[in-house]
C-alpha cells in the first residue's frame, strides 16, 4: 500500500502535504477553534477536509485557501459542503488577507478573520510572517505546526528556542500552546512531532515601534550572529556607548534581550538611522 496515498489522493512532497486523520486530534483542534455561526473563518491548506468538514458543520460559511489544484477542485464538488465553501485556489504566501477582509465588509459587521490550518511545515515560518502583516484584521489563528516551531513561538528570553520568530510573533500576538500531536495522527506520517498553537493579535501593541523596518533589522542582525555579543553583532548599527546609554549590556547576546529591549533599540534607530545603512538591502534569514 502506498503510505502517501489517503482517500484517493497522493500527498505531494513539493506542497509539504501530510494529511490529518486521527479523530481525537481533529476533535481537540476543532474544540480549540470553537467555530460559531456568523463568524468569518478562513482555513489555509484544507487538504482532504479533515478540519474543514467538522468546522463547516458548526458554521454557516467557510473560506478555504488551497494551492493544490486537484484538492481545490475536490472541495468545490464536496458532496455536502460545497454550498458553504468559498474555495480560493492560490498560494497563501501570496494571498492578500487584508483585501479579503475589505471585500467581505467585515469592519462594518464588527468582525475579523478567524484563521486556522494544518500548515505545510516547509513554509510555516514565512507564512506566519506573512499573516502578521494583517494582524489588525485577524481575531485569532490556530495552526498545526512542527513542535519545534511552536516551542520557538512560545519561548522566553534566555532560552535556545528564543529567536526572531519569537519576537516578531509575540510583538503582534499573545501565543498559547494548545495540544501536542504525534506523527501517527497523519498520513504520510511526518518525521517530526507536531503541536497546535493559538495566536491572538494584541488589541493594542504592548511595545509599539515607530518603524517596523528597524525592529526587523535589529532582530535579524542580532540573531543571525547570536553567538556573538551584541556589542559585536550590532556594531554596524550602534556604538558601544549608544548601547550602554540604551541600557543594553555589551556582553549580552541576542537571546538575552526582551521584546521591550528590541523595541527600544528599534525606536532609537528610527530616530537616529545610521547613514551607511540602506533600507532597501535584503535582510538574510539565517539564525545561527
Swiss-Prot record:
Pfam families: RrnaAD. The gene is rsmA. This is Ribosomal RNA small subunit methyltransferase A. It comes from the Bacteria. It catalyses: adenosine(1518)/adenosine(1519) in 16S rRNA + 4 S-adenosyl-L-methionine = N(6)-dimethyladenosine(1518)/N(6)-dimethyladenosine(1519) in 16S rRNA + 4 S-adenosyl-L-homocysteine + 4 H(+). It is an enzyme of class 2 (transferase). One of its GO terms (molecular function) is RNA binding. Specifically dimethylates two adjacent adenosines (A1518 and A1519) in the loop of a conserved hairpin near the 3'-end of 16S rRNA in the 30S particle. May play a critical role in biogenesis of 30S subunits. It comes from Mannheimia succiniciproducens (strain KCTC 0769BP / MBEL55E).
Amino acid at each position: 500500500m502506498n503510505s502517501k496515498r489517503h482517500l484517493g489522493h497522493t500527498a505531494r512532497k513539493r506542497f509539504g502535504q501530510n494529511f490529518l486523520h486521527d479523530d481525537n486530534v481533529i476533535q481537540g483542534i476543532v474544540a480549540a477553534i470553537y467555530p460559531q455561526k456568523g463568524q468569518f473563518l478562513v482555513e489555509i491548506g484544507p487538504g482532504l477536509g479533515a478540519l474543514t468538514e467538522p468546522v463547516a458543520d458548526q458554521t454557516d460559511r467557510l473560506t478555504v485557501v488551497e494551492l493544490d489544484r486537484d484538492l481545490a477542485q475536490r472541495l468545490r464538488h464536496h458532496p455536502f459542503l460545497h454550498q458553504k465553501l468559498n474555495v480560493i485556489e492560490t498560494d497563501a504566501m501570496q494571498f492578500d488577507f487584508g483585501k479579503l477582509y475589505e471585500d467581505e465588509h467585515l469592519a462594518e459587521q464588527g468582525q475579523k478573520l478567524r484563521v486556522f490550518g494544518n500548515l505545510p511545515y516547509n513554509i510555516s515560518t514565512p507564512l506566519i510572517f506573512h499573516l502578521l502583516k494583517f494582524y489588525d484584521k485577524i481575531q485569532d489563528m490556530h495552526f498545526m505546526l512542527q513542535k519545534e516551531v511552536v516551542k520557538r513561538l512560545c519561548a522566553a528570553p534566555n532560552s535556545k528556542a528564543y529567536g526572531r520568530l519569537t519576537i516578531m510573533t509575540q510583538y503582534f500576538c499573545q501565543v498559547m500552546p494548545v495540544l501536542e500531536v504525534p506523527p501517527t495522527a497523519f498520513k504520510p506520517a511526518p518525521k517530526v512531532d507536531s503541536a497546535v498553537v493559538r495566536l491572538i493579535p494584541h488589541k493594542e501593541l504592548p511595545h509599539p515601534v515607530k518603524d517596523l523596518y528597524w525592529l526587523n533589522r535589529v532582530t535579524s542582525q542580532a540573531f543571525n550572529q547570536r553567538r556573538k555579543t551584541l556589542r559585536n553583532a550590532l556594531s554596524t548599527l550602534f556604538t558601544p556607548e549608544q548601547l550602554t546609554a540604551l541600557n543594553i549590556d555589551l556582553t549580552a547576546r541576542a537571546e538575552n534581550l526582551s521584546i521591550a529591549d528590541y523595541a527600544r533599540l528599534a525606536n532609537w534607530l528610527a530616530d537616529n538611522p545610521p547613514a551607511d545603512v540602506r533600507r532597501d538591502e535584503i535582510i538574510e534569514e539565517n539564525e545561527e
